[in-house]
Amino acid sequence: MKEPPVQLDLPDNPWLELRRLTPARIALGRTGTSIPTNAQLDFQFAHAQARDAVHLPFDPAGLSSQLAERGRDSLLLHSAAADRHSYLQRPDLGRRLSDESAQALRDHASANPGGVDLAVVVADGLSALAVHKHTLPFLTRMEEQTHAEGWSLSPVILVEQGRVAVADEIGQLLGAKMVVILIGERPGLSSPDSLGLYFTYNPKVGLTDAYRNCISNVRLEGLSYGMAAHRLLYLMREACRRQLSGVNLKDEAQVQTLESDDPDLMKGNFLLSSPDD
């Protein structure tokens, strides 16, 4: 008589439940001493997406048109990096404007004297995909709050082949009290479209990262647009009060928690947010 198959009493894997809560690669399983084929293919696909995000061309003209439809002026500038190859090989060139762009910005500042509270800069960085996807919805949320508090803003400065520090030169040339740059972050294997915000008080050429505050991972699966705008406005208020930014200015904005009963305070957690937040 044939013996019945042995029923193995396998232990529960608590990681499987956690997989649905994060895009991180956990509980992949294994096949022999390797990971399953599907997990390997998924990894290779994510790596290809990250590489594509770095080389995706920025479309400043298209973004400028979308801003114009919403009633926002913009200026199209270029860093000193002539192309993507130069940008990747020479980070220093991405931190400064080209001579032509710097002069164009001086001309704009001369025609519009008086400066502004906040210069708004958008640069492709290492992920134009992030900029294309998240700039407009974030600016909408940010400008709702800056308008309510009476802050004056510059036109949106669109910089091709730009790095974080290019915002300091732009803020200085515009005579801005503060500057924020929206820039595509280095793509990760689970986040090829992550937008970063870098904020500086009293911007000028030559400042280091120690003088900047960073708000990172702005995207639907990360920090919501509303919460990112909330944190930025907090930094703006505190920077003006204390006249500084960077390592000496801590982000102590109200942090949203899972235990909060206020639905408006739940928008910073991607587990509880709707796609429209």
UniProtKB/Swiss-Prot annotation:
Annotated GO MF terms: cobalamin binding; ethanolamine ammonia-lyase activity
Subcellular location: Bacterial microcompartment
NCBIfam families: PRK05465.1
Function recorded in the entry: Catalyzes the deamination of various vicinal amino-alcohols to oxo compounds. Allows this organism to utilize ethanolamine as the sole source of nitrogen and carbon in the presence of external vitamin B12.
Assembly information from the UniProt record: The basic unit is a heterodimer which dimerizes to form tetramers. The heterotetramers trimerize; 6 large subunits form a core ring with 6 small subunits projecting outwards.
Family stated for the protein in its record: Belongs to the EutC family.
Protein name: Ethanolamine ammonia-lyase small subunit
Organism annotation: Pseudomonas fluorescens (strain SBW25)
Gene: eutC
